[in-house]
Amino acid sequence: KPDCPLICTMQYDPVCGSDGITYGNACMLLGASCRSDTPIELVHKGRC
């Protein structure tokens, strides 16, 4: 597994991931995708 050294702000700007989960912002989605076995893509801005 690669390191996932993302440091995200806590600014709330929700995005919906391809896993059906709402992330607090795009950076948080990228961090989750990095740690996941399957890539998570941004489906749309806003809550899922």
Curated annotation (Swiss-Prot):
Disulfide bonds join 4-34, 8-27, 16-48. It holds the Pfam family Kazal_1. GO terms for biological process: cell differentiation. The record marks 10-11 as: Reactive bond. Keywords: Disulfide bond, Protease inhibitor, Serine protease inhibitor. One of its GO terms (molecular function) is serine-type endopeptidase inhibitor activity. GO terms for cellular component: extracellular region. Residues 1-48 form the Kazal-like domain. Signal peptide: none annotated. InterPro entries: Kazal_dom, Kazal_dom_sf, Prot_inh_Kazal-m, Prot_Inhib_GrowthFact_Antg. Transmembrane segments: none annotated. Exhibits strong inhibition toward Streptomyces griseus protease B (SGPB) (AC P00777). This is PI-actitoxin-Avd5a.
